[in-house]
């Protein structure tokens, strides 16, 4: 069955208004997409994190006429529509198309991230099985890749690892598969903790090796290795707390940082850590160091 697809160029402030309007006129789905390959910056509390220039993508059942639909939207919102485009698209197996787009990826010398439905390219390598879900972290983003490559290059034997802002659990699970004794994960999002637990089970990691907590429930820990792939603002504001979670001589890896934010984040940790040169990839950076 064909579908009518309508794409609208909006600002974050317009998102809720147009989402409600599209659903009211019969959209079967409404999705927000990055219009210009931009990073998501830290949102205000209790708001949807969106890009400065966002595309709203709405799908309608085949046979829906675009012109009266768009006119109805203008009546509902009380203003002319922003820049928009409509087209009829053919149906496809969306799940299969998505699965085909997620292929095994290698990080460093030992580590592979492998979709759970895909055969491991190197069965004797360290293979982390993963299903992308609601939480961030599949290895495709430069910040995740930078952290995975760093973990692959570390000797993690007998180490306790803390993954602060664990998302899908990919970093903590990678650390465990690479030899860590235990990994603790924490995230503000309950769905992220559920995704971490599911992905740990997929990799035969026992619950006791990977305890998960909301931040307010996190016990007092001292980690041999702390990884935090979140955002620059929280990394700066949480610097005293995160520094205090790392043992003397322990290691730190931070990402989720735009290149222009790197110096500010590094400065927040410089008094407690001997920092390595900043690693850069595609406009994002990783900051690593050792606790004094």
Curated annotation (Swiss-Prot):
SUPFAM superfamilies: S-adenosyl-L-methionine-dependent methyltransferases (SSF53335). Gene3D superfamilies: Vaccinia Virus protein VP39. It is found in: Cytoplasm. InterPro entries: Ribosomal_L11_MeTrfase_PrmA, Ribosomal_PrmA_MeTrfase, SAM-dependent_MTases_sf. Belongs to the methyltransferase superfamily. PrmA family. S-adenosyl-L-methionine binds at residues 144, 165, 187, 229. GO terms for molecular function: protein-lysine N-methyltransferase activity. Keywords: Cytoplasm, Methyltransferase, S-adenosyl-L-methionine, Transferase. This is Ribosomal protein L11 methyltransferase. Methylates ribosomal protein L11. The keyword Metal-binding does not apply. It comes from the Bacteria. Pfam families: PrmA. One of its GO terms (biological process) is methylation. GO terms for cellular component: cytosol.
């Amino acid at each position: 069955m064909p579908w009518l697809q309508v794409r609208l160029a909006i600002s974050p402030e317009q998102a809720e208004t147009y989402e409600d309007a599209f659903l009211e006129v019969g959209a079967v789905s409404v999705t927000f997409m990055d219009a210009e390959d931009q990073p998501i910056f830290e949102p205000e509390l209790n708001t949807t994190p969106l890009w400065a220039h966002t595309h709203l993508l709405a799908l309608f059942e085949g046979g829906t006429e675009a012109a009266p639909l768009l006119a109805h939207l203008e009546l509902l919102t009380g203003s002319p529509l922003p820049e928009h485009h409509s087209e009829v698209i053919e149906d496809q197996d969306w799940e299969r198309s998505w699965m085909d787009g997620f292929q095994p990826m290698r990080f460093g010398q030992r580590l592979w991230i492998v979709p759970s439905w895909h055969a491991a390219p190197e069965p004797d390598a360290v293979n982390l099985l993963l299903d992308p879900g609601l939480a961030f972290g599949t290895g495709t983003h430069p910040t995740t890749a930078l952290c995975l490559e760093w973990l692959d290059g570390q000797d993690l034997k007998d180490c306790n690892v803390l993954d602060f802002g664990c998302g899908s659990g990919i970093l903590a699970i990678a650390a465990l598969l690479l030899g860590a004794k235990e990994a603790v994960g924490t995230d503000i999002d309950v769905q992220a903790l559920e995704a971490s637990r599911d992905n740990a089970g997929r990799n035969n990691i026992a619950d006791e090796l990977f305890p998960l907590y909301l931040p307010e429930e996190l016990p007092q820990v001292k980690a041999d290795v702390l990884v935090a792939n979140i955002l620059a603002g929280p990394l700066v504001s949480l610097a005293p707390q995160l520094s205090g979670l790392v043992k003397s001589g322990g290691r730190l890896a931070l990402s989720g940082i735009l290149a222009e934010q790197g110096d500010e984040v590094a400065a927040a940790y410089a008094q407690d850590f001997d920092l390595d040169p900043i690693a850069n990839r595609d406009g994002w950076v990783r900051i690593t160091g050792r606790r004094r």
